[in-house]
Design a protein with these regions (language model features):
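Elongated, amphipathic alpha-helical interaction scaffolds
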Residues: 1-269
């Protein structure tokens, strides 16, 4: 790989570089291919934890963004090595969405001022079982006896319209980066490949990745920034080794317990 083709990993860039308005195009590209509609970022919201050290517990940035209709807010873009918090991750993102809903409506405002929330989580740990690398969750109300979807009546621009509850309730995207193991063909797949490997195809036309090739070049950082970045990568490698070792020790312990149970059953017979 040529030196100019080395790009900064997204989990690092999102905390240190992509908060700058000049770099919003990178984030907008990811959200555009994920939501399948144009997204324009209005501002980056400060997070509850902007820890910048190698032993970060969280790597979280809150993003306020509009779609092409100016209707939505992207509340949380989560890219993290959640090494000790993964057992309650769903509860954590639920809390984050609930907090965002209340933060973005003032006391005394009407219910129609409640904003649509999209929660996007980029996961570098194993959250559970599943065959896909991208999962999408949203609320639907199904008839218990009929199985039909409920349409609710509401008012928009002085007109009475019907809409699905999913258009109002939060939506969740879980990107399981480590589960992606195919050749990237679509813009979304190119993005997942970059999230996993840090590599960007030189001929990419994927929204956001074109900008990333210009703005996230490793050697554009200062020597001090490169040192901090390299330390970040080393910390990740060490943590991953610890996790792999612990997982293997757990499997070996399970195998030993199984063999011992087998011997005991044999003696009893």
């Amino acid at each position: 790989m040529e030196t100019m083709d080395r790009y900064i990993r997204f989990d690092w860039a999102i905390k240190r570089l992509l908060r700058q308005k000049a770099n919003f195009g990178v984030l907008e590209g990811l959200l555009t291919v994920l939501l399948n509609e144009e997204v324009k970022i209005v501002e980056i919201l400060e997070s509850e934890s902007n820890q910048l050290t190698a032993d970060d517990k969280f790597n979280r940035v809150d993003i306020k963004a509009k779609n092409s209709k100016g209707e939505i807010i992207i509340e949380s873009e989560t890219a993290e090595y959640c090494l000790s918090e993964e057992l309650y991750y769903l509860e954590r993102i639920l809390y984050g969405v609930a907090k965002a809903i209340t933060e973005h409506i003032s006391l005394g405002e009407r219910y129609y001022e409640v904003k649509k929330i999209y929660s996007v989580s980029i996961l570098y740990f194993d959250i559970g079982r599943g065959e896909d690398y991208l999962y999408h969750g949203q609320n639907t109300f199904l008839g218990v006896h009929t199985g039909d979807q409920l349409l609710v009546t509401t008012k928009e621009r002085d007109a009475i319209v019907t809409k699905l509850p999913a258009e109002v309730f939060p939506e969740y995207f879980l990107i399981r980066v480590n589960e992606f193991d195919k050749a990237a063909v679509t813009p979304l797949e190119e993005w997942i490949e970059y999230l996993k490997t840090g590599r960007i195809r030189p001929d990419t036309v994927a929204p956001g990745l074109v900008e990333a090739r210009q703005k996230l070049i490793y050697y554009n950082m200062t020597a001090e920034e490169r040192h901090a970045y390299d330390e970040h990568l080393n910390a990740i490698m060490i943590q991953n080794d610890v996790l792999s070792t612990a997982a293997e020790e757990g499997r070996e312990e399970g195998r030993q317990e199984g063999r011992e149970e087998g011997r005991q059953e044999g003696r009893q017979e």
